[in-house]
Amino acid sequence: MKEEMNLPENAFRELKDGEEYKPLMSPDKVYPEVNGWSVTWGIMMAIIFSAAAAYLGLKVGQVFEAAIPIAIIAVGVSTATKRSKALGENVIIQSIGACSGAVVAGAIFTLPAIYILQAKYPDMTTSFMKIFMASALGGVLGILFLIPFRKYFVSDMHGKYPFPEATATTQVLVSGAKGGDQAKPLLIAGLVGGLYDFIVASLGWWNENFTSRVVGWGCDLADKAKLVFKVNTGAAVLGLGYIIGLKYAFYTCLGSLVVWWLIVPGMSIAFHDSVLSAWDPSIVKTVGAMSPEEIFRAYARSIGIGGIAMAGIIGIIKSWGIIKSAVGLAAQELKGKSDVDENVKRTQRDISFKIIAIGSIVTILITFLFFWFGVMEGNLLFAVIAILLVAVIAFLFTTVAANALAIVGSNPVSGMTLMTLIFASVVMVAVGLKGPGGMLAALIMGGVVCTALSVAGSFITDLKIGYWLGTTPKKQEGWKFLGTLVSAATVGGVMMLLNETYGFASGSLAAPQANAMAAVIDPLMNGVGAPWVLYGIGAVIAIVLTYFKIPALAFALGMFIPLELNVPLLVGGAINWYVTSRSKDAKVNNERGEKGTLIASGFIAGGALMGVVSALLKFGGIEASIAENWWVNPMSEVCSLIAYILLIGFFIRATKKKSRNYNP
């Protein structure tokens, strides 16, 4: 366990002509990877982190990638049990467990919209089986569609893509193999973050948000000028911002500030006495009579939706060459002699293209039958159009999802799914499927596409980790299917639990992406139309941003996720910049940065898991919170700010504290 283990010098740079990357585990040897230990722990991680990610995603609209915390737990357990040669096993644990965040993102960005619209249309009904099938089938399609692109992203483009999350996870696994004291900072941070978020969610000792309305002039500014500042003070969201990093968090927050501080006040000035209800007859207030939050929900967020859709289209155009080459490679292999080329190194063996082709056809057929009998109530035409839309869009957007993970470590599936929903709704209405039945069908279709893209993007991270360390891709690919099915079952259960406990229509669960999906699909399916002008403005903004090489997707995401959830991302990103740049010694900065990643992972895992515990307590009728009466008092927000500053202080101080035996 303590043998000399370091990644090769050329692990993170482009290879020179004729140079070959040699992974940590030799391609010529066989190592323990898939066994009872790794599969059991992988399934446990998938269940635990699916529940945690579902709660966090529905509460604040952000889903963390579970790869890093799962890798740390895998390392901690293998170290505690003194398992030898556990590196390959830990990669499998991480790969199976990481299905959690990916499947959750796919499910919760779309399927809760069914519950949200159910309040308005009681005829719309869903079940555990529908949620499970949409998530499971989408996840399986995502894995099958991504495998042909593995070699391009992880091997051909070696050193050209940063793979931020894969890098962090790989470093954790390597550090564990060295025998360092990796788990301690994570456990302490998990306890701190978990206790902090539990106090807010279950006890209500301080407000979960700090806003400018805490003072009198702030209330006046919000009422008259429609200007407001808000920040969620939770530990989990702060940790998320740290892992995302300053650059991506900055552009996301910038998009949010443009909407909240320019567009929202600007609309109030320009249309102060107007009722803008052309695409939503339920709007009866003048713009001037609305709060900033109401203007955002009714109008400004639609600009972000248009921006996300256009950024997705630009992504497909940029990826067209990759798609063509991968399809060509798959066609060549299908015409080849055998399933497995014995000359291919262990570290380059994939599931054969024949199995992928057969698996894809069977999965598409099962999805078609699910649509035909489970969603479209036996209408063959609707089912055929639905499966064609889902299969083509999921395949085309697979490279966009993988590209996003490879560059920024964050998968913009919500934007791509919004575009899918808009397109699918227009097509389904054209063939005669409207009203609540059409909404349900389009949302289930969106759930399948969203999960496919989310799992595909996440899986490229796992495969890059395996490439750096020297595991067998075929084993990662095969066991990823099991993790996907387990995660799909877990997220279905958690989603139904949270709906019973809080209710998606109550406002207690932010679920911003699902609310956006509901807002888009309702007018489209009722023939009212949609805010095409606002979508168009967003699309133009995305084109202009792309021209100036500004990440349009990050900016547009910020435009439609609420301000209070974007500001803490910037705070976390700023902490990342601060702790990794204060020393003149690059090695010290690097050590602090990695320590910060462990602490942020602890905040995320601890905060999210306690969120699930809080939901279970509430569901069981155990209520000890003083929030209902206390949170209306501005002092609850003052307490929130003080607690947040102390939390940030702990974070920064903990990164500078040198652990005994800490060996990054």
Briefly describe each language-model feature range.
Residues 1-664:
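Alpha-helical multipass membrane-protein architecture
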